[in-house]
C-alpha cells in the first residue's frame, strides 16, 4: 500500500501510528521493521521495562512556566526527543529520510542520519535543520570510514554517533516467515561509491561468527583512530555494560547512547531502560547519556529522564509514522510525543526537565 501523506482518522496518541502501520506497509516490510532477532525477547523486554514503572502525580504544583527546553551537545533544543538512526527508510515511504529530515526540522528535533540510509547524507542534510548528527558504521577499509567522516563534516553534521553493537545481526524470524527480501530500490546510498568486500568465508572448521562476521568488528584501536580523525564530538551508541560506559567515557567519548539496537542484535539482551540507572551511576551526574529502545509515548520519555537519561531517541515509531503519513506523520508523531510529555510533567508537578527525578516514579507492581 502507498502512504496517504495525510493524518488518518483514529490517531489519538503517538503509539497509534504503530497500530496503523500494517495497513500502510506490505507484510514483509512491516515484519522487517517491527521484528528483532531470534524470538523478539529483547523487543518485548524494552516495552515491558517501561510498564514496570508508574509516574507519581503531585498536587498543587505551579507549573504555569513549564517547558521542555534543554541544551544538548551545544544545541538548544525545544524538547528531549530525537529521531534515532534507522536504515532503509524507503521501505516505509518513497521520500525516505528526506521526509523524516523535514519533520525533524519542522518540530525542532535533532535528526540522527544513518550510514545505511536510502538517501545520501548530503541530501538529508539539505532537507534538515541545523540539529543533525550522523551515525557511523565503521567500514572494513579505514579510508572509506574517513571519507564518510569528511562528508559528514562538510555537510554540517554536528556530531558523529558511532554504533558498536551491530557487528552481528541475526535474521528476524518474523521477516523470514513473511518472505522478506530487501527491495532493489532500498540501497545504502552513502556506500554506493565504496567497493564492498565479499562476505568473509571461514575456512573449514572455523566459525562463521568468530572468523567470519566478527573479522571486521570495531576494536579499541579503531575507536582511538576515529577520535583522532574528526573535529566533531563522537557519541557511542549501543552501550549496556557499566564498565564499557566508564571506559568509553575515559577514552574521550562525548556522550553515550544506552541501547540494545532495538532488540536486533542480541535476543536476550537486557532492556535499555533496565540498564540506564546503572550506567548513570557509572558515568556520574552531568555526563551526557541518551536512551533508545521501546519509546512509544511521552510517558516513556518521562520515565527514561527520571531514571537518568538526558534525552531519548525514537526509532521504530518514526518509521511507522513515515509509512502512514509521510513527513506530516513523523512531525505529527513528534508533536504528540511532546504534548504527552508536557501532560505527564504537569501531572507529576515538574515544570522543567531538571525536576524529573527518580522519586517521580514508583514501581508499578
Curated annotation (Swiss-Prot):
<comment type="similarity">
    <text>Belongs to the FMN-dependent alpha-hydroxy acid dehydrogenase family.</text>
</comment>
<feature type="binding site">
    <location>
        <position position="264"/>
    </location>
    <ligand>
        <name>pyruvate</name>
    </ligand>
</feature>
<keyword id="KW-0560">Oxidoreductase</keyword>
<keyword id="KW-0288">FMN</keyword>
<feature type="binding site">
    <location>
        <position position="261"/>
    </location>
    <ligand>
        <name>pyruvate</name>
    </ligand>
</feature>
<feature type="binding site">
    <location>
        <position position="259"/>
    </location>
    <ligand>
        <name>FMN</name>
    </ligand>
</feature>
<dbReference type="InterPro" id="IPR000262">
    <property type="entry name" value="FMN-dep_DH"/>
</dbReference>
<feature type="binding site">
    <location>
        <begin position="292"/>
        <end position="296"/>
    </location>
    <ligand>
        <name>FMN</name>
    </ligand>
</feature>
<feature type="binding site">
    <location>
        <position position="137"/>
    </location>
    <ligand>
        <name>pyruvate</name>
    </ligand>
</feature>
<feature type="binding site">
    <location>
        <position position="163"/>
    </location>
    <ligand>
        <name>FMN</name>
    </ligand>
</feature>
<dbReference type="InterPro" id="IPR012133">
    <property type="entry name" value="Alpha-hydoxy_acid_DH_FMN"/>
</dbReference>
<protein>
    <recommendedName>
        <fullName>L-lactate oxidase</fullName>
        <ecNumber>1.1.3.-</ecNumber>
        <ecNumber>1.1.3.15</ecNumber>
    </recommendedName>
</protein>
<comment type="subunit">
    <text>Homotetramer.</text>
</comment>
<feature type="binding site">
    <location>
        <position position="316"/>
    </location>
    <ligand>
        <name>FMN</name>
    </ligand>
</feature>
<keyword id="KW-0285">Flavoprotein</keyword>
<dbReference type="InterPro" id="IPR037396">
    <property type="entry name" value="FMN_HAD"/>
</dbReference>
<feature type="binding site">
    <location>
        <position position="237"/>
    </location>
    <ligand>
        <name>FMN</name>
    </ligand>
</feature>
<dbReference type="GO" id="GO:0003973">
    <property type="term" value="F:(S)-2-hydroxy-acid oxidase activity"/>
</dbReference>
<dbReference type="GO" id="GO:0010181">
    <property type="term" value="F:FMN binding"/>
</dbReference>
<dbReference type="Pfam" id="PF01070">
    <property type="entry name" value="FMN_dh"/>
</dbReference>
<feature type="active site" description="Proton acceptor">
    <location>
        <position position="261"/>
    </location>
</feature>
<feature type="binding site">
    <location>
        <position position="135"/>
    </location>
    <ligand>
        <name>FMN</name>
    </ligand>
</feature>
<dbReference type="InterPro" id="IPR013785">
    <property type="entry name" value="Aldolase_TIM"/>
</dbReference>
<comment type="function">
    <text>Catalyzes the oxidation of (S)-lactate (L-lactate) to pyruvate, with a reduction of O2 to H2O2. To a lesser extent is also able to use glycolate as substrate.</text>
</comment>
<feature type="binding site">
    <location>
        <position position="32"/>
    </location>
    <ligand>
        <name>pyruvate</name>
    </ligand>
</feature>
<feature type="binding site">
    <location>
        <begin position="85"/>
        <end position="87"/>
    </location>
    <ligand>
        <name>FMN</name>
    </ligand>
</feature>
<feature type="domain" description="FMN hydroxy acid dehydrogenase">
    <location>
        <begin position="6"/>
        <end position="365"/>
    </location>
</feature>
<feature type="binding site">
    <location>
        <position position="114"/>
    </location>
    <ligand>
        <name>FMN</name>
    </ligand>
</feature>
Amino acid at each position: 500500500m502507498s502512504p496517504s501523506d495525510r493524518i488518518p482518522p483514529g490517531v489519538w496518541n503517538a503509539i497509534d501510528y504503530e497500530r496503523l502501520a500494517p495497513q500502510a506497509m506490505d507484510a514483509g516490510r512491516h515484519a522487517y521493521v517491527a521484528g528483532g532477532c531470534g524470538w523478539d525477547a529483547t523487543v518485548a523486554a524494552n516495552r515491558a521495562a517501561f510498564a514496570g514503572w508508574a509516574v507519581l502525580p503531585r498536587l498543587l504544583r505551579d507549573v504555569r512556566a513549564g517547558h521542555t527546553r534543554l541544551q544538548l551537545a551545544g544545541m538548544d533544543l525545544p524538547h528531549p526527543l530525537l529521531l534515532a538512526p534507522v536504515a532503509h527508510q524507503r521501505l516505509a515511504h518513497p521520500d525516505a529520510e528526506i521526509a523524516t529530515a523535514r519533520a525533524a526540522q519542522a518540530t525542532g528535533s535533532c535528526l540522527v542520519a544513518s550510514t545505511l540510509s536510502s538517501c545520501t547524507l548530503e541530501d538529508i542534510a539539505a532537507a534538515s535543520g541545523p540539529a543533525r548528527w550522523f551515525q557511523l558504521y565503521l567500514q572494513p577499509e579505514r579510508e572509506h570510514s574517513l571519507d564518510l567522516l569528511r562528508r559528514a563534516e562538510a555537510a554540517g553534521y554536528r556530531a558523529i554517533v558511532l554504533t558498536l553493537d551491530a557487528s552481528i545481526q541475526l535474521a528476524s524470524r518474523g521477516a523470514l516467515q513473511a518472505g522478506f527480501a530487501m527491495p532493489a530500490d532500498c540501497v545504502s546510498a552513502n556506500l554506493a561509491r565504496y567497493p564492498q568486500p565479499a562476505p568473509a568465508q571461514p575456512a573449514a572448521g572455523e566459525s562463521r561468527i568468530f572468523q567470519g562476521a566478527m573479522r571486521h568488528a570495531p576494536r579499541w584501536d579503531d575507536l582511538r583512530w576515529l577520535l583522532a580523525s574528526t573535529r566533531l564530538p563522537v557519541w557511542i551508541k549501543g552501550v549496556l555494560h557499566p564498565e564499557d560506559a566508564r571506559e568509553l567515557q575515559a577514552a574521550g567519548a562525548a556522550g553515550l547512547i544506552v541501547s540494545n539496537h532495538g532488540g536486533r542484535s542480541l535476543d536476550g539482551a537486557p532492556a535499555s531502560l533496565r540498564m540506564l540507572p546503572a550506567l548513570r551511576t557509572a558515568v556520574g551526574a552531568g555526563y551526557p547519556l541518551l536512551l533508545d529502545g521501546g519509546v512509544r509515548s511521552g510517558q516513556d520519555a518521562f520515565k527514561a529522564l527520571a531514571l537518568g537519561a538526558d534525552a531519548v531517541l525514537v526509532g521504530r515509531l518514526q518509521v511507522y509514522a513515515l509509512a502512514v503519513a509521510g513527513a506530516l506523520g513523523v512531525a505529527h508523531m513528534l508533536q504528540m510525543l511532546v504534548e504527552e510529555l508536557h501532560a505527564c510533567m504537569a501531572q507529576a508537578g515538574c515544570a522543567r526537565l531538571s525536576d524529573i527525578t527518580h522519586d517521580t516514579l514508583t514501581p508499578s507492581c
